[in-house]
């Protein structure tokens, strides 16, 4: 029969790929309550520990008192409030660009930017490991769509030689499932030499990379000429919600006119923008957060490598432990949970077949002692997978 959803769901269960939503019963933080169980969490993207920061909460409360709780309309009607505008100005300053444009989600920002910039007769080239929202944007744009080998400037160059029309090269800044950095200097050189624009989604780099937290573009010392289109999200290191596109005056004005996900949606609550303004202030001022996070990353990598765990080449808070088999990844996640630790198993189709993993994420809110607890639990649990295979 048509729409045999039960069969599709059963097939996913049989392949150990069925997803379920854990119920969070506490605020974000290193220690959470999930499905009634108190756990030490290593799976949140709250990289700087700002999601439950008292000053950010107070800013939201004050914003609700001053501006109410609803955006009321789209930005182009009567939904563009003063706090929205102030956030855009703060983001432009943080990223060193003339303008920034606020979107309600990262998915919308990626779809909006790509579909506004390229269409039929144009070309969009993407890293094969890009986030789903980037791939969807490329497919929806109607442009000729192709993917180059992961983080491979030579592969990109060969595809650029066959490009037609306006050409947009799209890459994650930090790859969300591997934690590695895009080779932006090389990609920018290749794109510029062939007259293409480079678009970078820095969802996981903003706040964690760069001296001021400006992200991967600041990390590599690049500018708007190297990366004309910069995307960032506010629900990860910033600890609030939303996203933005930053670039030239002409780029932002073009998105206001042509980016459908921006035009045809109600603006985010202005009180949320008030909270984001405070989180951006803390992100820049409290540099100790990035310094402490970097120390935790070193601690985890050194400890995991001593155990012989298979890590990715990641200098970021994303530290995947590659298992391979989906059932085994789920088993390791369950073993850790039995010991009071929450580490999510990531399986296909989110990652390529045969590369299921535990995606460990670290936060500036974690302590060295908590990271050591994770390492101790891994040392106890990981060998049980090998014993099961024996």
UniProtKB/Swiss-Prot annotation:
<feature type="binding site">
    <location>
        <position position="19"/>
    </location>
    <ligand>
        <name>substrate</name>
    </ligand>
</feature>
<dbReference type="InterPro" id="IPR015424">
    <property type="entry name" value="PyrdxlP-dep_Trfase"/>
</dbReference>
<dbReference type="InterPro" id="IPR015421">
    <property type="entry name" value="PyrdxlP-dep_Trfase_major"/>
</dbReference>
<feature type="binding site">
    <location>
        <begin position="106"/>
        <end position="107"/>
    </location>
    <ligand>
        <name>pyridoxal 5'-phosphate</name>
    </ligand>
</feature>
<comment type="function">
    <text>Catalyzes the decarboxylative condensation of pimeloyl-[acyl-carrier protein] and L-alanine to produce 8-amino-7-oxononanoate (AON), [acyl-carrier protein], and carbon dioxide.</text>
</comment>
<feature type="binding site">
    <location>
        <position position="350"/>
    </location>
    <ligand>
        <name>substrate</name>
    </ligand>
</feature>
<keyword id="KW-0663">Pyridoxal phosphate</keyword>
<dbReference type="Pfam" id="PF00155">
    <property type="entry name" value="Aminotran_1_2"/>
</dbReference>
<feature type="binding site">
    <location>
        <position position="233"/>
    </location>
    <ligand>
        <name>pyridoxal 5'-phosphate</name>
    </ligand>
</feature>
<dbReference type="GO" id="GO:0030170">
    <property type="term" value="F:pyridoxal phosphate binding"/>
</dbReference>
<dbReference type="GO" id="GO:0009102">
    <property type="term" value="P:biotin biosynthetic process"/>
</dbReference>
<protein>
    <recommendedName>
        <fullName>8-amino-7-oxononanoate synthase</fullName>
        <ecNumber>2.3.1.47</ecNumber>
    </recommendedName>
</protein>
<keyword id="KW-0808">Transferase</keyword>
<dbReference type="InterPro" id="IPR015422">
    <property type="entry name" value="PyrdxlP-dep_Trfase_small"/>
</dbReference>
<comment type="pathway">
    <text>Cofactor biosynthesis; biotin biosynthesis.</text>
</comment>
<dbReference type="InterPro" id="IPR004839">
    <property type="entry name" value="Aminotransferase_I/II_large"/>
</dbReference>
<dbReference type="GO" id="GO:0008710">
    <property type="term" value="F:8-amino-7-oxononanoate synthase activity"/>
</dbReference>
<comment type="similarity">
    <text>Belongs to the class-II pyridoxal-phosphate-dependent aminotransferase family. BioF subfamily.</text>
</comment>
<feature type="binding site">
    <location>
        <position position="131"/>
    </location>
    <ligand>
        <name>substrate</name>
    </ligand>
</feature>
<feature type="binding site">
    <location>
        <position position="204"/>
    </location>
    <ligand>
        <name>pyridoxal 5'-phosphate</name>
    </ligand>
</feature>
<dbReference type="InterPro" id="IPR022834">
    <property type="entry name" value="AONS_Proteobacteria"/>
</dbReference>
<comment type="subunit">
    <text>Homodimer.</text>
</comment>
<keyword id="KW-0093">Biotin biosynthesis</keyword>
<dbReference type="InterPro" id="IPR050087">
    <property type="entry name" value="AON_synthase_class-II"/>
</dbReference>
<dbReference type="InterPro" id="IPR004723">
    <property type="entry name" value="AONS_Archaea/Proteobacteria"/>
</dbReference>
<feature type="binding site">
    <location>
        <position position="176"/>
    </location>
    <ligand>
        <name>pyridoxal 5'-phosphate</name>
    </ligand>
</feature>
<feature type="modified residue" description="N6-(pyridoxal phosphate)lysine">
    <location>
        <position position="236"/>
    </location>
</feature>
């Amino acid at each position: 029969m048509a729409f045999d959803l039960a069969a599709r769901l059963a097939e996913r269960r049989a392949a150990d790929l069925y997803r379920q939503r854990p119920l969070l019963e506490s605020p974000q933080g290193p220690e959470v309550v999930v499905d009634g169980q108190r756990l030490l969490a290593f799976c949140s993207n709250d990289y700087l520990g700002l999601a439950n920061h008292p000053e950010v909460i107070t800013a939201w409360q004050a914003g609700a008192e001053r501006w109410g709780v609803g955006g009321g309309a789209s930005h182009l009607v009567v939904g563009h409030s003063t706090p929205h505008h102030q956030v855009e100005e703060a983001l432009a300053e943080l990223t060193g660009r003339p303008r920034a444009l606020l979107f309600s989600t990262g998915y919308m920002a990626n779809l909006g930017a790509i579909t506004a910039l390229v269409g039929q007769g144009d070309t969009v080239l993407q890293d094969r490991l890009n986030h789903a929202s980037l791939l969807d944007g490329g497919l929806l744009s109607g442009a000729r769509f192709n993917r180059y080998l992961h983080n491979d400037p030579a592969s990109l160059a060969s595809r650029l030689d066959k490009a037609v029309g306006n050409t947009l090269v799209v890459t994650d800044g930090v790859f969300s499932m591997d934690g590695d950095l895009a080779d932006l200097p090389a990609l920018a050189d290749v794109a510029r030499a062939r007259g293409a624009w480079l678009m970078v989604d820095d969802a996981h780099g903003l706040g964690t990379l760069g001296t001021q937290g400006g992200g991967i573009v600041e990390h590599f010392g690049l500018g708007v000429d190297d990366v004309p289109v910069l995307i960032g999200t506010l629900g990860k290191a910033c600890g609030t919600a939303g996203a933005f596109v930053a670039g030239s005056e002409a780029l932002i004005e073009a998105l206001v006119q042509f980016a459908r996900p921006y035009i045809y949606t109600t603006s985010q609550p202005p009180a949320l923008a008030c909270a984001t303004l405070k989180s951006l202030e803390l992100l820049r001022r409290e540099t100790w957060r990035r310094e402490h996070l970097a120390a935790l990353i070193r601690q985890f990598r050194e400890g995991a490598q001593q155990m012989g765990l298979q890590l990715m080449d990641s200098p970021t808070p994303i530290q995947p432990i590659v298992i391979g088999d989906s059932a085994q990844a789920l088993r390791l996640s369950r073993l850790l949970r039995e010991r009071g630790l929450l580490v999510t198993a990531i399986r296909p189709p989110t990652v390529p077949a045969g590369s299921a993993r535990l995606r460990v994420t670290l936060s500036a809110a974690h302590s060295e002692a908590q990271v050591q607890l994770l390492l101790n639990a891994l040392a106890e649990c990981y060998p049980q997978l090998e014993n099961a295979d024996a």
